[in-house]
Amino acid sequence: MTCMEFETLQKIIAEVLDVEEDEITMDTRLLEDLGADSLDAVEIIMGIEDELGITVPQEELESRNLATVGDVYELINDTMA
């Protein structure tokens, strides 16, 4: 499989959190910088799954610290590998 484009992740996060795409970088913290909560995180993952036609294993979600956008990006690309 291929890697997810970062711009795709930016778009999904921007839509879920109602922020501008240019505010979102790999180092952006989901909670502190974007104000995301656990429900927002679920919506982001669901949006990614729908967009890419993948399923992120629950055990992967539970075992990773998804503090930054880069953490989410890495999780998705590992899932797609």
Where in this protein do the model-derived segments appear?
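Two-component histidine kinase catalytic core, primarily the HATPase_c
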Residues: 40
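Phosphopantetheine-dependent thiolation modules in NRPS/PKS and related acyl-activating systems
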Residues: 2-36, 45, 50-81
